[in-house]
Regions:
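C-terminal transmembrane helix and the adjacent membrane-cytosol boundary/short C-terminal tail
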Residues: 172-173, 219-227, 268-301
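Transmembrane alpha-helix signature in integral membrane proteins
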Residues: 43-44, 92-127, 281
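Generic hydrophobic transmembrane alpha-helix motif, especially the helices
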Residues: 82, 86, 116-120, 126-189, ...
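Transmembrane alpha-helices
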Residues: 101-117, 146, 152, 206-238, ...
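Transmembrane alpha-helical segments of polytopic membrane transport and secretion proteins
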Residues: 1-45, 287-301
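Periplasmic/extracellular loop-to-transmembrane helix junction in inner-membrane transport proteins
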Residues: 29-36, 63-111, 255-275
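Glycine-rich helix-loop "coupling/hinge" segments at transmembrane-helix boundaries
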Residues: 144, 155-158, 170, 185-186, ...
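Amphipathic cytosolic juxtamembrane alpha-helices at the membrane-cytosol interface
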Residues: 90-105, 109, 129-137, 187-191, ...
Length: 301
């Protein structure tokens, strides 16, 4: 059986290839734009390295991060222990490597939760207005009026210590800025001519929201979420420092600083190295967020 070049099967395959080529070209162009900004490239590279380290932690870490060796306690950085050891003789480099998994777990889980939640509440408030807007925005104002770390601390204190409770607490404090941003975007789009035209064609409110307004709000929301990731890392580290995050002996970066602060004057590496890990990764997400803003939001130029 032969297939004509003009058959629907052939034309469909050709259209599929063209779509793939266009998508690949857009991806290459997007990466090229990011690479032209040195800080964005550095931030993206650090985050990519963090992902690789978290995925291949068992292959990268030379020691078990939980096994204690009191004979090697508080050893300074050397060829055997690159970043030294803590007060229990555990290799700090190995604990940092495995701690990257905890950090990414919190960041990714909070981000995929607060994004849809904030977007849903924000576009609903901006589009429907009236009492819906008033109620949702007053609730948002209540959450925003408290510092995020203080509010997260209150939620974790109520829920109890633990990694899952930290995720819930940070989620409850991270959605309000996204909701306000989505509301502002929706207010600017609600009276646009093309939205009025869609309504005149008989489109329902749900169709207008999900097919027209939400896609236009996504770039700003993605940028905000990316820049929020640095705050998520710092909040998680703060809760871990206070003993409310991942519980010992889990290698959470904030908890590592807390347990090593007693020895920080004599053994600087116990506190300094986890602190640098938090600082570098927070800056990386900020750099990446700035680059995404320049690419996805032309109004920022």
């Amino acid at each position: 059986m032969t297939v004509s070049l003009d058959s629907p099967l052939s034309s469909g395959a050709g259209e599929g290839r063209q779509r793939l080529q266009r998508a690949a070209a857009r991806a290459v162009g997007f990466v090229g734009k990011m690479a032209r900004n040195p800080l964005t490239a550095i931030g993206g590279g650090i985050i990519f390295l963090l992902l690789v380290v978290a995925i291949f932690a068992p292959l990268i870490a030379p020691y078990n991060p939980l096994v204690q060796d009191l004979n090697s306690a508080l050893v300074a950085p050397n060829a055997q222990h690159w970043f030294g050891t803590d007060e229990f003789g555990r290799d700090i480099f190995s604990r940092l490597v495995y701690g990257s998994r905890i950090t990414l777990y919190i960041v990714l889980l909070v981000s995929v939760t607060v994004g849809p939640l904030g977007l849903l509440l924000g576009v609903s408030a901006g589009y429907f207005g009236g009492k819906v807007d008033m109620v949702l925005m007053r609730v948002t104002d209540i959450f925003i009026s408290f510092p995020s770390l203080v509010l997260a601390l209150a939620f974790v204190a109520a829920l109890g210590p633990g990694l899952e409770h930290v995720v819930i607490a940070i989620t409850l404090t991270a959605w309000p800025p996204i909701a306000r941003l989505a509301r502002a975007e929706t207010l600017s789009l609600r009276q646009a001519d093309f939205i009025s035209a869609v309504r005149l064609q008989g489109a329902s409110s749900a169709r207008v929201l999900w097919r027209h307004i939400v896609p236009l709000c996504l770039p700003s929301v993605i940028i905000r979420i990316t820049m929020n990731m640095a705050g998520i890392i710092l909040t998680a580290a703060g809760l871990g420092f206070l003993g409310l995050g991942a519980q010992p002996p889990e290698p959470e970066w904030g908890a590592m600083i807390s347990s090593g602060r007693t020895y920080m004057m004599e053994c600087w590496w116990v506190v300094t190295i986890p602190g640098l890990a938090i600082l570098i990764n927070s800056l990386a997400f900020n750099f990446l967020g700035d680059g995404l803003r320049d690419i996805l939001d032309p109004r920022s130029e």
